[in-house]
Amino acid sequence: MRHQCRVPLLGKPADQRKALLRSLTTELIRHGQIMTTKTRAKAVRSEVERMITLAKDGSLAARRRALGYMYDKQLVHSLFADVQSRYGNRNGGYTRITRTLRRRGDNAEMAIIELV
């Protein structure tokens, strides 16, 4: 049984949710930090950590899994190239979520998620 193994649904159908998480993951790795809602930041954190762990593995199978998930091929190659120098001795905890002011239009909790 899958009790308490709930993924954040983000108020979207499964295909839109997967596309949103892929897009946020790609943009976070590209820019180093993004501002989004707190719930989306918490949801994308596990995906980003998974991509960085794949890059630390460095095998061909890991590279192909990352290419299948992220939207930018060049970004995957650059991630695999510089991840050992940046996160070589760190065992997880590659991201930091900082809460910021609420969004003006709908008062949603906003957060900045960044790579450490």
Curated annotation (Swiss-Prot):
This protein's record includes keyword Transmembrane helix: no
One Pfam family hit: Ribosomal_L17
GO terms of biological process kind: translation
Residue ranges that the Swiss-Prot or TrEMBL entry lists as coiled coil: none
Family matches, as Gene3D superfamilies: Ribosomal protein L17
Keywords: Ribonucleoprotein, Ribosomal protein
An example molecular function term from Gene Ontology annotations: structural constituent of ribosome
CC per GO annotation: cytosolic large ribosomal subunit
SUPFAM superfamilies linked to this entry: Prokaryotic ribosomal protein L17 (SSF64263)
NCBIfam families from the UniProt entry: L17
Family: Belongs to the bacterial ribosomal protein bL17 family.
Self-association and partners: Part of the 50S ribosomal subunit. Contacts protein L32.
Protein name per Swiss-Prot or TrEMBL: Large ribosomal subunit protein bL17
Gene source species: Rippkaea orientalis (strain PCC 8801 / RF-1) (Cyanothece sp. (strain PCC 8801))
